[in-house]
Each structure stands twice: as C-alpha cells, then as structure tokens.
Amino acid sequence: GGVSEEIEGYENNLELELFKEYRDVIGLFKYVVETERRFYLCNHVDVQARPVGGDVFFELTLSDAWVWDIYRSSRFVRSVRVITYKDVNVEELSKPELDIP
C-alpha cells in the first residue's frame, strides 16, 4: 500500500478523464499529430523539415489544437510550435459522414 499506489490511482483517474475528454472532442478536429513526446489533435498543421549540418529537425506549427496531457487543466491551445529531431506522424482523421457512398 502507501503513497505510490495512491499516486498511481490518481494518475489512472486523470488518464481516464483525459480519455473521456479525448473521445468527446475528437470529432472537432481534422488531424492527429504524434511526436515522440506528445499527442495532439488539431485542425491545421504545417510541418517544415529544416536541415542542420548533417541532421534534419522538424518544425511543426499546429493551430486550433488539443493536447493529450494529464497535467494540463486546459488542453485546448490556439497554436503550438513543436521542434523535434524524431519522427513525426500526421494523420488525417476520416469524418464518418464522408464515408457514405
């Protein structure tokens, strides 16, 4: 027992709340963006590859975004700039109403 279990329970609760919020808001967004550190939903995304020496980093600009982060009280963000050297995954969310033949 003890503190670590309580903290774990608290974090599990936060994750659950976050998941419910995610389920509620995903319909508002067009894209899912994953970096090595974060997961975002957004309506506009711009990815620029920038060479530095022999390396490349990615500069992402997201606007009208939502951030998967259990420690933020407000997860809606007007714009986010992310710089990463790791892979970036951008997926367009399919809107169910567009799938009807």
What are these regions (language model features)?
Residues 2-101:
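Conserved RNA-binding domains used in RNP assembly and mRNA/RNA metabolism
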